[in-house]
Amino acid sequence: MEVLRMFRKGAVAFSQATLPLLLKGVKQESKYPPSLIFTGATASVKANAFMSSFNTGKYALRALSSSLAKEFGPQGVHVGHAIIDGVIDIPRTKEWLKDAGPDAKIDPDSVSIT
């Protein structure tokens, strides 16, 4: 359940820290509406066997983004949930797809600012 705790605490803390800044962007009448985009996976809409913690965390993240969209959308902040599937090349996935080509895994820098 550590995965669920990580998804929940990280996303909520990030939202709490960024939404006040995004609301300021609305007040400044930015040319582009401020946006908060969460990245999910197909697991957020379809469960997989042996992935209960991951599935639960992704479902929770999708629910959070949906709730925030309903709460902050009318105030001018766009909140979205994008499904991006693939194995991210991190130490935990080192052995996954090891015999596949160099493009089989996603570079972590291509999906986030690190």
Question: Which residue ranges define each predicted feature?
Answer:
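Hydrophobic positions on the long internal alpha-helix
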Residues: 14-18, 22
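Electropositive phosphate-/nucleotide-binding environments in soluble metabolic enzymes
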Residues: 8, 12, 58, 105-112
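Generic alpha-helical propensity signal that fires on short helical segments
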Residues: 19, 54-55, 63, 95-102
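C-terminal helical subdomain
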Residues: 74-90, 94-114
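Catalytic loop of short-chain dehydrogenase/reductase
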Residues: 9, 23-60, 65-66, 70-73
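Residue-level preference for alpha-helix termini and adjacent loops
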Residues: 18, 50-53, 58, 87, ...
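Active-site Tyr-X3-Lys motif and surrounding loop/helix of classical short-chain dehydrogenase/reductase
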Residues: 1-6
